[in-house]
A protein has these predicted regions:
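Post-HEXXH active-site segment of zinc metalloproteases
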Residues: 201-224
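Noncatalytic, helix-rich "gating/capping" subdomain that lines the substrate-entry/channel surface
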Residues: 3-59
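Short acidic (Asp/Glu) and glycine-rich catalytic loops that position anionic groups and cofactors
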Residues: 120, 171, 203-210, 265-274, ...
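Post-HExxH zinc-binding segment in Zn-dependent metallohydrolases
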Residues: 216-253
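Active-site recognition of the HExxH zinc-binding catalytic motif
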Residues: 189-202, 226-227
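Contiguous, non-catalytic segments that form substrate-binding/exosite surfaces or channel walls
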Residues: 35-186
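Conserved small/polar residues in nucleotide/adenosyl-binding loops
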Residues: 1-5, 287-289
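Long, amphipathic alpha-helical stalk/connector segments used for oligomerization, subunit docking
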Residues: 238-287
């Protein structure tokens, strides 16, 4: 009776909730409690290691989290490859075979392109690594969020070690950022990226708030929105034309940088070990690795 009364969206919601319930109830409670505790400790160790530039602080926690994740996921889908289960949880219908085929195709074109571009060294401009007051960077963040359409009445902004976006409903979407005193571009593009996530969440139909349909069900879709704002819009010179003068008022070092020089810098391609700071080209290489 109830099934006949549900439309397609609510049938999907019920089906997804039952699937998640069936998976999660298979996990022993004591194991999951230990997993959550380990994750919290791992997060603290990661932050300490990051600030100390000492991977050895985090290494044992990383090993422990990998092993515990295998145990937990092994219970959710018994008999299924653990990594296939993890992929499917992020992107329903995805598996290792599909990813391997896709990555092989991308790698064939991408690696020669990266080598070709990075062989031509682009001169460093110290202006982009000059001191930038964190309060000024916060004001720049709001300039950018307002500019791209983030709704202040349905969101908030905070600070964390690693930028992220989370939502509790379409009317409560929270963005975080991190401000490096000598890397203002980092916070600027994090603001645009996370703003892309947030705008997506703020425009979900409020009828589905607090349901699995009230947030994007596929990570690929969500990340496509954030990276569209960050790269397709944010690295285009036309994006900056209406606000570049205001940027110079907030961060005076940019007053002496032409818009064309700014565009070249924000489209710089170079190898990096940090995914979130990687450029549009080498970012994919880090994902592939």
């Amino acid at each position: 009776v109830y099934k006949r009364q549900l439309d397609d969206t609510w049938r999907f919601i019920v089906k997804r909730m039952k699937r998640d319930y069936d998976r999660n109830k298979r996990i022993p409670a004591d194991l999951y409690e230990a997993f959550v505790r380990a994750a919290a400790e791992s997060g603290n160790a990661w932050e300490e290691a990051k600030n100390a530039s000492d991977f050895s602080i985090y290494a044992p926690h990383l090993r422990n989290m990998i092993e515990m994740t295998k145990q937990v996921i092994g219970y959710t889908d018994p008999g299924k490859d653990v990594y296939d289960t993890l992929l499917e949880q992020c992107e329903e219908g995805m598996d290792q075979a599909t990813i391997d085929r896709l990555f092989e195709e991308v790698k064939t074109e991408l690696i020669p392109l990266v080598e070709q571009i990075t062989a031509k060294k682009m001169p460093e401009n110290p202006t982009f690594h000059a001191y930038a007051d964190p309060d000024a960077q916060r004001r720049v963040q709001w300039l950018l969020l307002d500019y791209i359409g983030f709704r202040r009445d349905a969101g908030a902004v905070g600070e964390t070690e690693h930028p992220f976006t989370t939502n509790f409903s379409s009317k409560d979407v929270r963005v975080t950022n991190h401000y490096y005193e000598t890397e203002p571009l980092s916070a600027m593009f994090s603001a645009i990226h996370e703003g892309g996530h947030a705008i997506f969440e703020q425009n979900v139909n409020p009828e589905y708030d607090n349901t699995v349909a009230g947030s994007c069900c596929y990570m690929g879709v969500h990340e496509s929105q954030s990276r569209f704002y960050e790269n397709i819009l944010g690295r285009n010179i036309n994006f900056w034309k209406p606000i570049y003068e205001k940027l110079g008022e907030l961060l005076p070092q940019f007053k002496n940088v032409t818009l064309e020089a700014f565009e070249r810098e924000i489209n710089r391609v170079e190898n990096s070990m940090v995914r979130t700071e990687a450029d549009e080209v080498t970012y994919l290489s880090l994902i592939h690795i």
